[in-house]
UniProtKB/Swiss-Prot annotation:
Protein name as annotated: Endothelial cell-selective adhesion molecule
PTM sites of type Phosphothreonine: T336, T338
Signal sequence region: 1-29
Statement: the UniProt record of this protein carries the keyword Transmembrane helix: yes
Amino acid sequence: MILPARTPETSLLRVLFLGLSTLAAFSLAQMELHVPPGLNKLEAVEGEEVVLPAWYTMAREESSSHPWEAPFLIWFLEQEGKEPKQVLSYFKGSLSNKPGVTLVHSISTRNVSLRLDALQEGDSGTYRCSVNAYDSDGKNIGHSIKTIELKVLVPPAPPSCSFQGVPYVGTNVTLNCKSPRSKPTAQYQWERLAPSSQVFFGPALDTVRGSLKLTNISTAMSGVYVCKAQNRVGFAQCNVTLDVMTGSKAAVVAGAVVGTFVGLVLIAGLVLLYQRRSKTLEELANDIKEDAIAPRTLPWTKGSDTISKNGTLSSVTSARALRPPKAAPPRPGTFTPTPSVSSQALSSPRLPRTDGPPPQAVSLTPGGVSSSTLNRMGAVPVMVPAQSQAGSLV
């Protein structure tokens, strides 16, 4: 490659080119964002507000912007493990911002400070401010970026107090205190209120865990114990009452607890028994009931049957024997006996006695008809079982 010979004119052009390049680079780097020294890391309390201070300047120019200057401003929030998110942007009079995020000053003053209202713990992170300046022709005349780290502190939430162990004389009891939320982590302090005021220290007190160990307690250690959880931005407290019992008092309390437990068990048992009984009665009411077996009926004997029971003989006539035989029509004025059937044999009626010889007994059938008459009529004597007054056969 052949290089042209260096002449004074060529050297001058080279110097001019390098100078213009330097001026162009300086013009792009003439914008600068500023953050006050020591304010690039801020801390604020949850629920309050904070201002992230920042402004930009143009080299060798006044602090106020020119009419032809058009800044493009963006504030980002960067959090660990999350994508950056835009919280505010401004360009040519158009402002877009999240709720609770505003600019402190007008953009024409080149002050781009950011205000955050009603802070929450989730607002912690690194805020990045980016400013690009354009001229009236839309040419970029400067760009700068600054970051501010914000840490939102949380005062301790009200803690909860409790104790472990049975507080009677000679035993050990541990008092516990814990706040569910605190940033930074809360430190704990225990003290006993008047009339026997006392502040506790290690090794009985664990300021990180919030526990206080009381050993070989006595009745003099009874009282109200207060736990205070605190950090750099606030504190909260709770209390617990310790009533040290003697042996007899402890026995009474234990008996009351056991009695209560037994009573609850008995009540539960009665309720279950009542429910089971009600269920059983309901099932019985819904069952289909069968009728009782009817008593057996004895068949009537036929006219020709003869039954002897316990030596009792009775005479009955069957339906066949009761049929009158075919005979000549009765004479006028003659009585025709009608046979009757009875389930019991009737004794012959006794006639009044006279001085004459005793009358001969006449065997009559029930209804006043003699057996001889029935025999002439064709009746057949049969034996049937007799029936007692209770309805049973004899």
